[in-house]
């Protein structure tokens, strides 16, 4: 029993030291990539991967008390990744949490305050490739479709979701785990499925 308690204490100390180390690395990464960031940003288990195209030519703003968890119990064994293209705008509000989430921003993604995003979720404001096969073959990057995403305050997005280009998720709404969101969701509603559909009002 004593050994077990000692092991738990040691493990907790290691985790605490590790979290502070990875938080420091993330602060350094944000500083050198011209990210505007607030206070008390928390990183657990591994610092997020931050990829800012062309030496910080996009715009990233991260608010206060934002938490990034990578490789945690509910992270789908994923690391948090933030990828922002040239001239794109990513804004993350206060008191928001991400668990093994990938954000890819080519135009504009806005995440409000008090938002929770579950493990393995992907947020893409772009199709990544042209829809037309001939344009894909010729790698016509200018033909790729993209549109802004807005996730309003107090939204909860379950694990393993895909949030696709051009959608707005209204305040206090819930997206069920494993959903693919292809159209906008009004406030105070639960949606789920592939593609996500209305389930009930809150």
Residues covered by each model-derived region:
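Domain-scale signature associated with acetyltransferase and cell-envelope carbohydrate enzymes
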Residues: 1-124, 152-153, 171, 187, ...
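Glycine-rich hexapeptide-repeat left-handed beta-helix
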Residues: 3, 111, 117-202
